[in-house]
């Protein structure tokens, strides 16, 4: 995962989604020791601390660390990569929270400083294993991230693309390193592809073309709601709770488009939440 400077827009957008994050995450916390991995600007970490937990934070970006250190009230702040949690924290945690990070682990991989960095699902599996090592028995792992649509390979269509949308599509297609996500066909103002590929493009589009040098590199949706549970079970976790949500901001940002699948109006869920317990 790169440690390049994150633009202020990134922190602003992450901060504006705090209400959704807090609503989804806080009710499932177990304490007292909670670690927020990929804490960014620290809005969620601060909310965790404010709820009475002994909150610690981890992030790889130096500017995120500067923000986190400026918050005050956090137990520990460490700079590093997600799979390095056992190396950076000596005591086990009661809960590890990972919000909007596992897709970055997939997209950018583990620390480039390690002897054999890994990418993709190998990086996800390694990171889940390392999280388990850092949890007490019965401890919780809470993942909030993109969720792949059910029946992800079924076709979907987007009609009504604007000239700016079409320009963004060509830029996205040029930048994306993920063949499955580039399986899209543009005809006039209409775009067709799998539900998964369509959803990935639409959500990236909401960030704006100026963010594509970073955002188009990422694969946001790694698993369907059910499949994440199966994968985590293989790593020694039991599912406690899962849900998917569609954030209104995404719907509003894309309201000029007509999105259909199977001949019916369709809009993909924007986030999933998975609460696991260490077996």
Feature map (PLM): residue ranges:
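A short glycine-rich, Lys/Arg-flanked "PGG" loop and its adjoining helix->strand segment in the class I
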Residues: 115-137
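Short alpha-helix
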Residues: 219-236
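A conserved beta-strand element that flanks and buttresses the S-adenosyl-L-methionine
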Residues: 97
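Conserved beta-strand signature within the Rossmann-like core of class I S-adenosyl-L-methionine
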Residues: 138-145
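Class I SAM-dependent methyltransferase "Motif I" SAM/SAH-binding loop
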Residues: 38-42
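Conserved alpha-helix/loop element of class I SAM-dependent methyltransferases that forms part
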Residues: 13-31
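Class I SAM-dependent methyltransferase Rossmann-like catalytic core
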Residues: 1-18
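Class I SAM-dependent methyltransferase SAM/SAH-binding core
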Residues: 43, 47-85
């Amino acid at each position: 995962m790169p440690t390049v400077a994150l633009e202020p827009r990134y922190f602003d957008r992450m901060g504006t989604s705090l209400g959704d994050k807090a609503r989804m995450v806080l009710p499932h916390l177990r304490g007292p020791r909670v670690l927020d991995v990929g804490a960014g600007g620290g809005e969620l970490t601060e909310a965790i601390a404010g709820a009475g937990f002994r909150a610690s934070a981890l992030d790889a970006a130096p500017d995120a660390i500067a923000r986190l250190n400026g918050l005050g009230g956090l137990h520990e702040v460490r700079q590093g990569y997600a799979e390095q949690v056992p190396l950076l924290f000596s005591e086990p945690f009661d809960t590890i929270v990972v919000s909007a990070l596992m897709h970055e682990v997939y997209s950018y991989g583990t620390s480039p400083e390690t002897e054999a960095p890994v990418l993709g699902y190998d990086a996800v599996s390694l990171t889940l294993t390392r999280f388990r090592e850092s949890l007490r028995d019965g401890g919780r792992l809470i993942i909030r991230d993109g969720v792949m649509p059910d029946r992800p390979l079924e076709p979907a269509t987007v009609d009504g693309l604007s000239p700016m949308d079409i320009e963004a599509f060509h830029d996205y297609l040029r930048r994306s390193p993920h063949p499955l996500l580039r399986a899209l066909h543009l005809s006039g103002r209409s775009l067709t592809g799998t539900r998964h590929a369509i959803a990935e493009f639409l959500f990236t589009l909401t960030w704006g073309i100026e963010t594509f040098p970073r955002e188009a590199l990422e694969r946001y949706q790694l698993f369907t709601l059910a499949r994440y549970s199966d994968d985590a079970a293989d790593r020694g976790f039991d599912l406690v709770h899962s849900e998917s949500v569609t954030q209104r901001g995404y719907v509003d940002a894309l309201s000029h488009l007509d999105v259909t699948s199977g001949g019916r109006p369709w809009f993909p869920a924007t986030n999933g939440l998975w609460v696991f317990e260490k077996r």
